[in-house]
């Protein structure tokens, strides 16, 4: 069986690079202001630019409108949206 490993809640370059070095397949970024792991989209861009391997990038949205989601995906076109909430 093949496993797909995604580490969510990344908030800094050091953690992202450690996850990359340990062989994870994907990074997840929480774009929900009420989360303790919340990160601004500009910081996500900076972190993803520091990654050398082609890790999958997930953007986690909680009850966000279509306009905000589209804006984020326009800025990080390779990202995969992940939705939570109502």
Question: At which residue positions do the language-model features occur?
Answer:
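Conserved N-terminal beta1-alpha1 strand-loop-helix module at the mouth
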Residues: 1-86
